[in-house]
Curated annotation (Swiss-Prot):
Transmembrane segments: none annotated. The gene is rpsB. SUPFAM superfamilies: Ribosomal protein S2. It comes from Beijerinckia indica subsp. indica (strain ATCC 9039 / DSM 1715 / NCIMB 8712). It comes from the Bacteria. This is Small ribosomal subunit protein uS2. One of its GO terms (molecular function) is structural constituent of ribosome. GO terms for cellular component: cytosolic small ribosomal subunit. The keyword Ubl conjugation does not apply. Belongs to the universal ribosomal protein uS2 family. One of its GO terms (biological process) is translation. The keyword Ribosomal protein applies. Keywords: Ribonucleoprotein, Ribosomal protein. Coiled coil: none annotated.
Length: 336
């Protein structure tokens, strides 16, 4: 097995090149920005490609030496991808909430992990001798600890490298890693601060497809490290995941890429658009859209028929999106 292959086109198709609105940028990210389009910064993927390769090599080398990699991503879009990637590559993860001291106060965290293990044992044995109320309280405590610590309960000590999605949200994790001199590989969107990041990877940290791609590549790099450490002794790590298609490199400017990728957001990027201008919408429907993570015309304009059907079903809009032509109307509002 070798380091996972990827291409600039693959990154483009995942939406990795879309940054935030230009006024929300961090000036320290200027070297990684290609330009702006429709007031959205475009990330320079010509720099992302070699930097991502460097991060993948660092992760593979860390695991090959017997080191541990901790995946960190607690935002909604990243939670599932982070857990799946860590589990596939026999590594560790935090995808719920970063507890203060997870790295710098490992002794206390270890005590909580021991408590989790004890609760698992008691409940697995049937919790004989306990009342129904005691079993219920114990089960709730176990579930709470599992949610917070389940991804690191087998880690056995602080990690040798951490991989982070959204450095703004995971600032506490990065600060703790810095204090312990633990290398950090991180996805850096245009509103992030690259200072203190050992292996910066410029890219969109909100789009679900991009996050899934990053996590898959990191997981496969860790699997490559496992293969190297075991000398491939009958262990075919390549069977554990589907390869990322190696597409031909993209030539020319980024305008050749897809216009937008539909994604849900935790918060608006800058000022939200007036979604009440969409036909048949009103305050209640706008609130439903905002609660679902839709704040801008460009999100609606980027929807595929499958996206329309799913959102209509989830929000119980009775076919309104397609019937009232929201996608075309959103495109018109963007153009006006």
């Amino acid at each position: 097995m070798s380091l996972p292959e990827f291409s600039m086109r693959g990154l483009l198709e995942s939406g990795a090149h879309f940054g935030h609105q230009a006024h929300r940028w961090n000036p320290k990210m200027a070297p990684y920005i290609f330009g702006a389009r429709n007031n959205i910064h475009i990330i320079d993927l010509a720099q992302t490609v070699p930097l991502l390769h460097q991060a993948l090599k660092a992760i593979s080398d860390t695991v090959a030496r017997g080191g541990r990699v901790l995946f960190v991503g607690t935002k909604r879009q990243a939670q599932e991808a982070i857990a799946d990637a860590a589990q596939r590559s026999a590594q560790y993860y935090v995808n719920s909430r970063w507890l203060g001291g997870m790295l710098t106060n490992w002794k206390t965290i270890s005590a909580s992990i021991q408590r989790l293990r004890k609760l698992d044992e008691i409940l697995a044995s049937g919790a004989g001798g306990l009342t129904k109320k005691e079993r219920l309280m114990m089960s709730r405590e176990r579930d709470k600890l599992e949610k917070a610590l389940g991804g690191i309960k087998d880690m056995g000590g602080v990690p040798d490298l951490i991989f982070v999605i959204d450095t703004n949200k995971e600032q506490l994790a990065i600060q703790e890693a810095e204090r312990l001199h633990i290398p950090v590989a991180a996805i850096l969107d245009t509103n992030c601060d690259p200072d203190g990041i050992t292996y910066p990877i410029p890219g969109n940290d909100d789009a679900g497809r991009a996050i899934s791609l990053y996590c898959d590549l990191i997981a496969r790099a860790a699997l490559d490290g496992i293969s190297r450490s075991q000398g491939m002794g009958g262990f075919d790590a390549g069977e554990l995941e589907a390869p990322v298609e190696d597409l031909p490199p993209v030539e020319g400017e980024y305008e050749a890429a897809p216009t937008e990728i539909f994604e849900l957001l935790d918060a608006p990027r800058g000022a939200p658009d007036d979604l009440a201008k969409l036909p048949g919408s009103g305050p209640q429907i706008v609130k439903k859209l905002n609660d679902a993570g839709i704040f801008h015309y460009w999100q609606v304009a980027a929807m595929t028929p499958e996206d329309v059907a799913k959102l209509d079903h989830d929000l119980k809009l009775s076919g309104r999106i397609e019937r009232d032509g929201w996608v075309n109307q959103a495109r018109s509002l963007i153009a006006s």
